């Protein structure tokens, strides 16, 4: 067997005559994988009982780490080959094979029919309840290429068809230094889904690539600044980000567990550095599981994180352990949810029902600290 096979060659191989193992972490695998692939993280390969009598094809995100693993398996006597270009290349070809016109209509119907209650109604509820849109707004719908932002774009299109007042939309994609394959996947998905994107380029990935301490935080801050700046240049007064309900819950717990404070991700914010601009989060009430269900139902595949770190698989943990504090919190919430399915909603409600007279101390927006001892003996 060749040391490397292409995506085209893999498609020609009869299923059952080979084993395809995906060595990405479980979170990436769950968001999308090649049909028939089995998830085996590198640290578990010794326990996987791989077959000696048929080919083993190894896949990672971009074909880099999987190449090293396939070479090691060959040394151990297996008929192992690396999938050239990895999952990203397979995904790009899958999207290219689909028919845009019919698929876009099917995707739109799914939003208004099957997912009307679980997704579109919650989108509209957040818009109304948190007053995210006003007549005359021009919104930059910020698209990263992932499932959340792509769905948000379709929801905004649907909302505009039934609008009660006039507002404008710009579907804004910032390329911070994507690989050519990741850029192609974003553009192909946009064509497939009927989203007219406006793309602009920055060099953010180059700027943060060698940063040792918390490069993801710096990258996020820089990306938001560039999005605000481009949106303002295009005449927008708001940018929309695709954070969903689960992001909100995770942020609440992260602020407590790692930050020592009670703070949440707000549904809208005034920009501190771009006067007159606001950030809105219209996916605020939509559960991530429903977004995943929508993507699976429509056979849609999206990039998870297209930064240069994940391009080279350097963030893949050998033992499949959590890669970030947010992933650790996700796992904690999943564990809590096993014993009490209401725990997630209760966390959300807790920040809607804060009783200041039951808080030891709190800060006002200007930083002034108030203690429960203030006026205690009055």
Tell where the protein language model's regions lie, with residue ranges.
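Catalytic subdomain that performs nucleotidyl-dependent activation
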Residues: 168, 247-328, 332-333
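ATP-dependent adenylation/nucleotidyltransferase module used to activate substrates
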Residues: 99-254, 258, 262, 266, ...
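A short acidic, helix-capping loop that chelates divalent metal ions and anchors anionic groups
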Residues: 29, 91, 206-212, 313-315
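A structural preference for short, hydrophobic beta-strand core positions in alpha/beta folds
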Residues: 39, 82, 171, 199-201, ...
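Short, basic, helix/turn surface patches
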Residues: 105-110, 222-234, 267-274, 329-350
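The feature marks non-catalytic terminal segments
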Residues: 300-378
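Rhodanese-like catalytic fold shared by cysteine-dependent sulfurtransferases
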Residues: 1-19, 25-55, 61-113, 188
């Amino acid at each position: 067997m060749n040391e490397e096979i292409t995506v085209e060659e893999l498609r020609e191989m009869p299923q059952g005559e080979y084993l395809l193992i995906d060595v990405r972490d479980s979170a990436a695998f769950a968001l999308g994988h090649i049909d028939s692939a089995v998830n085996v993280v590198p640290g578990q390969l010794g326990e996987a009982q791989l077959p000696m009598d048929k080919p083993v094809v190894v896949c990672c995100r971009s074909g880099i780490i999987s190449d090293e693993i396939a070479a090691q398996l060959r040394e151990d006597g297996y008929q192992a080959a690396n999938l050239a270009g990895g999952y990203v290349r397979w995904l790009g070809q899958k999207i290219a094979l689909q028919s845009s016109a019919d698929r876009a209509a099917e995707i739109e119907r799914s939003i208004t029919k099957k997912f009307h209650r679980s997704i579109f109604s919650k989108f509209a509820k957040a818009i109304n309840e948190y007053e995210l849109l006003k007549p005359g707004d021009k919104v930059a719908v910020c698209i990263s290429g992932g499932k959340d932002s792509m769905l948000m774009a379709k929801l905004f299109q649907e909302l505009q068809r039934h609008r009660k007042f006039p507002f404008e939309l710009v579907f804004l994609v910032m390329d911070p230094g994507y690989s050519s394959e990741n850029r192609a996947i974003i553009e192909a998905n946009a064509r497939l889904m009927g989203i007219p994107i406006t793309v602009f380029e920055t060099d953010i990935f180059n700027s943060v690539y060698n940063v040792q301490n918390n490069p993801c935080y710096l990258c996020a801050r820089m990306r938001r600044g560039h999005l605000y700046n481009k949106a303002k240049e295009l005449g927008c007064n708001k940018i929309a980000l695709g954070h969903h309900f689960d992001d909100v819950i995770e942020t609440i717990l992260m602020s407590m567990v790692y930050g020592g404070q009670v703070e949440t991700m707000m549904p809208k914010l005034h920009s501190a550095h771009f006067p007159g601009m606001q950030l809105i989060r219209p996916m605020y009430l939509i559960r991530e599981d429903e977004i995943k269900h929508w993507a699976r139902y429509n056979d849609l595949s999206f990039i998870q994180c297209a930064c240069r770190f994940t391009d080279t698989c350097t963030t893949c943990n050998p033992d499949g352990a959590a890669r970030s504090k947010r992933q650790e919190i996700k796992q904690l919430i999943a564990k809590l949810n096993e014993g009490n399915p209401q725990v997630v909603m209760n966390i959300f409600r807790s920040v809607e029902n804060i009783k200041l007279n039951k808080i030891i101390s709190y800060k006002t927006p200007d930083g002034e600290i108030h203690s429960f001892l203030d006026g205690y003996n009055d």
